[in-house]
């Protein structure tokens, strides 16, 4: 733990100089004749053919995008195509030494990397493995198309696998159901797990943190292989990339992780440096590093073993990969490569290239890597022109056949959302219950019964009231934070892949003491602190989960959701459906909703998460519900945003008779719970507002003789309206409440649906009682911002049913609603 590494003022204040090592730039200088000792003729020709395959594939896409045809085959592809002509040597050189168990992640411009890694995997895998992969992947849909089309050609298994790879990738780009992910991923999200090709990403730099999670998965779960993160030079302007590099370079891997876990992450950050972002020139205009490799010196003391290499020479790239893979296998990662290359095409086919000169493009084209490699082999008499002509013809035939098959609507249909109206709906969630993601013992430090927190909890009362009905004191009652702890600790013992991390998760016990006691039970590699890097926390969780593990990560405050916006809104919720259900996403994100800490630490942003399809969202308010819902979340395979309120971490269980069970149990998502029965008015509450709603119910009953039924939503997505409908049928009136600002809140979504579903039973419009549309004020002023018990009576009186002789203290009239909206508050 950190206190084993005391920080002494005499050490940190002493005068010295920070030293940097020289960073190699294009130091490879071997001639092809010299390299012929390491490669056979077949090796050289395979490198050439793989480069040609990428070039022809990308040229074909450009032709289809600009002319709607290729080699006489007509097709219109309205989707995106970010092409990589010119970058072939970089992709093929990188993939040459990578094994199928090594994983690559890419960007929106990664067709070439997909083909290079796939072709390399095909070369290395045996025929039986390839046959099994093709026949079983998505029930063999893509395989049947290419197998039938090539039945008369007597192809070997490896040759057929090449046809399968090119066709499957193209069918995916063309949004066909026979594509690698039924056309739901498309050009910018294509991948193929059996060959070690992990998701590419349409969000620039998106792989920068996701790939780190994949590397964590390999390290923590002792899986062989390395991870390569392919990003462009433009991505170096993005925060998540820097956060990912920081997370990948944490000192604790080498200082605090123990045993075989000690050592750096097996990840290589490869910058496909084609000199441009979209149109901005990174060197000389939009960035200040001059050489992208320079940034490694700012990340860790090893300077990330950074090197700038000639990506126009496939042998130079292979040489660099050989050296860097050795570094990674020695547990000295991460590694950074600045791979110099160039794209001949624009950012996309519609790019007018107004930001660069034709002379610049011509200069690069004259040094074309494919043509230069061919000439070198001929000059060194390592191959003949006829060899290249045969390779070229084979490549053109493969690409042409792929176009013919992928363009044919009979052979390659699109997903029919007319006849299969629920096809995408079924893919949004996997809805599996998987107690452990892998069946093996869990790494733990002690037996559960020896844990001091477990022993302390055993002495607590698990119900909030004693036999006489008196409240149990807070220091003796089983609290909401204890319920969360029990569910989490149990899962650590049960699922060996589970990791938990975030800010102050270890030693501190979590910012709000939920994790207190875990440090004693869980080894460092399964529970650790991260930098203050919310994007990397969530992004790495995505990568860890899609690799096969389960993650429990934490954002200290809901207000920090914005710091991980892309990762929560674009990455976490979408990959299950974009993969056609192949990927699972067992990630639980704990999000604490604050109070007392003002405008940037006290916001309820549940609506941001409920708005995004693909996320499950829960918000328990009692110890019983917290434990049961957390258990359900950790047993599932879907991403869950698990909101918790800081107001109520210390509450005891007031509703479940008998208290919170010591054994494990689940509460199904989507089922609201009646916390108080009533007959005149329904209150549907979200989160901690439950307790103020219950106070209001007491006031209604005591002062006005109105019987109130209080329902705790518990879960927001999914949500079963049946219990609410039954209540409204009885009461005819309902208030929906929560601590979020009212405008745009999930409360208004609930109210809209209740208005539709209960129209015939409602005696008055549905009332929504949220917080004011202001900044959250100081604690001393919060009673004027968050819903208070008296407000329920005020809004009931002015919007639902007047109470004789009552005068509202807060205005909720229609006039007031119009006034506030005119002002935008």
Pin down the residues of each PLM region:
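Thiamine diphosphate
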Residues: 88-92, 195-415, 499, 517-518, 584-585, 646-825, ...
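Cofactor-binding active-site loop characterized by glycine-rich and histidine/acidic residues
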Residues: 56, 63, 67, 72-267, ...
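Phosphate/diphosphate-binding glycine-rich loops and adjacent basic-rich segments that engage nucleotide
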Residues: 597-684
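Conserved acidic/glycine
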Residues: 1-90, 131-132, 142-145, 152-153, ...
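Glycine/charged-rich beta-loop-alpha catalytic/anionic-binding loops adjacent to active sites
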Residues: 71-77, 148-153, 186-201, 224-230, ...
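General beta-strand structural signal in soluble alpha/beta enzymes
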Residues: 104-107, 182-183, 212, 229, ...
């Amino acid at each position: 733990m950190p206190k084993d590494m005391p920080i002494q003022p005499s050490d940190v204040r002493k005068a010295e100089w920070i030293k940097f090592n020289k960073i190699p730039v294009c130091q490879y200088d071997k001639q092809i004749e010299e390299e012929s000792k390491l490669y056979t003729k077949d090796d050289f020709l395979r490198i050439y053919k793989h480069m040609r395959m990428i070039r022809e594939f990308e040229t074909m896409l450009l032709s289809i995008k600009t002319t709607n045809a290729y080699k006489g085959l007509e097709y219109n592809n309205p989707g995106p195509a970010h092409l990589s002509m010119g970058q072939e040597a970089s992709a093929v050189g990188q993939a040459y030494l990578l094994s199928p168990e090594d994983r690559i992640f890419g960007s929106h411009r990664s067709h070439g990397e997909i083909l290079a890694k796939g072709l390399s995997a095909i070369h290395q895998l045996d025929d039986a493995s390839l046959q099994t992969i093709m026949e079983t992947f998505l029930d063999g849909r893509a395989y049947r198309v290419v197998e039938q089309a090539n039945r008369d050609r007597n192809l070997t298994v490896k040759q057929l696998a090449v046809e399968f790879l090119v066709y499957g990738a193209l069918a995916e780009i063309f949004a066909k159901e026979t594509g690698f992910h039924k056309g739901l991923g498309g050009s910018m999200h294509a991948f193929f797990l059996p060959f070690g090709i992990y998701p590419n990403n349409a969000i620039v730099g998106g792989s920068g943190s996701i790939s780190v999670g994949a590397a964590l998965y390999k390290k923590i779960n002792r899986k062989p292989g390395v991870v390569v993160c392919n990003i462009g030079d433009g991505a170096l302007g993005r925060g998540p990339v820097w956060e990912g590099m920081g997370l990948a370079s944490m000192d604790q891997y080498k200082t605090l992780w123990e045993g075989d876990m000690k050592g750096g992450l097996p990840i290589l950050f490869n910058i496909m440096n084609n000199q441009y972002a979209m149109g901005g020139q990174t060197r000389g205009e939009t960035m200040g590093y001059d050489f992208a490799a320079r940034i490694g010196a700012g990340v860790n003391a090893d300077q990330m073993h950074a090197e700038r290499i000639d990506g126009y020479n496939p042998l130079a790239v292979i040489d660099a990969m050989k050296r860097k893979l050795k570094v990674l296998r020695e547990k000295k990662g991460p590694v950074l490569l600045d791979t110099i290359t160039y794209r001949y095409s624009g950012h996309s086919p519609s790019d007018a290239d107004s930001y660069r000169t034709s002379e610049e493009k011509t200069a690069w084209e004259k040094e074309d890597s494919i043509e230069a490699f061919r000439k070198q082999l001929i000059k060194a008499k390592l191959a003949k022109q006829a060899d290249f002509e045969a390779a070229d013809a084979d490549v053109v035939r493969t690409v042409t056949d792929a176009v013919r098959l992928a363009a044919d609507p009979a052979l390659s249909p699109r997903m029919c959302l007319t006849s299969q109206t629920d096809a995408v709906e079924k893919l949004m969630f996997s809805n599996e219950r998987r107690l452990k993601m892998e069946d093996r013992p869990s790494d733990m430090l002690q037996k559960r019964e020896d844990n001091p927190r477990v022993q302390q909890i055993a002495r607590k009362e698990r119900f909030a009231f004693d036999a006489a009905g008196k409240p149990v004191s807070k220091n003796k009652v089983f609290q909401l934070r204890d319920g969360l702890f029990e569910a989490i600790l149990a899962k650590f013992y049960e699922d060996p892949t589970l990791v938990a991390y975030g800010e102050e998760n270890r030693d501190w016990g979590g910012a709000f003491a939920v994790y207190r006691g875990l440090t004693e039970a869980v080894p460092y590699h399964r529970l650790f602190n991260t930098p203050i890097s919310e994007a990397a926390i969530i992004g790495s969780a995505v990568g860890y989960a899609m690799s096969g593990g389960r993650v429990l990560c934490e954002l200290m405050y809901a207000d920090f959701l914005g710091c991980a916006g892309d990762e929560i809104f674009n990455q976490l919720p979408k990959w299950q459906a974009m993969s056609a259900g192949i990927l699972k996403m067992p990630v639980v994100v704990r999000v604490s909703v604050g109070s007392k800490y003002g405008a940037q630490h006290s916001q309820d942003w549940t609506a941001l998460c409920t708005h995004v399809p693909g996320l499950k969202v829960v918000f328990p308010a009692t110890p019983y519900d917290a434990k049961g819902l957390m258990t359900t979340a950790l047993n599932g395979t879907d991403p869950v945003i698990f909101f918790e309120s800081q107001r109520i971490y210390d509450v005891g269980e007031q509703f479940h008779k008998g208290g919170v069970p010591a054994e494990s149990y689940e509460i199904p998502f989507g089922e609201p719970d009646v916390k108080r029965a009533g007959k005149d008015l329904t209150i549907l509450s979200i989160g901690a507002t439950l307790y103020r709603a219950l106070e209001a119910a007491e006031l209604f009953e005591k002062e006005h003789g109105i019987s109130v039924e209080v329902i705790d939503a518990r879960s927001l997505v999914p949500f079963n309206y049946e219990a609410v409908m039954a209540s409204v049928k009885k009461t005819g009136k309902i208030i929906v409440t929560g601590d979020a600002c009212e405008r745009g809140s999930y409360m208004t979504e609930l109210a809209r649906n209740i208005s539709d579903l209960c129209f015939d039973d409602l005696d008055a419009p549905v009332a929504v009682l949220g917080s004011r549309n202001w900044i959250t004020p100081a604690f001393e002023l919060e009673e004027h911002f968050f819903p208070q018990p008296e407000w329920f009576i005020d809004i009931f009186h002015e919007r639902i049913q007047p109470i004789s002789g009552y005068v509202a203290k807060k205005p909720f009239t229609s006039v007031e609603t119009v006034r506030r909206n005119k002002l935008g508050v």
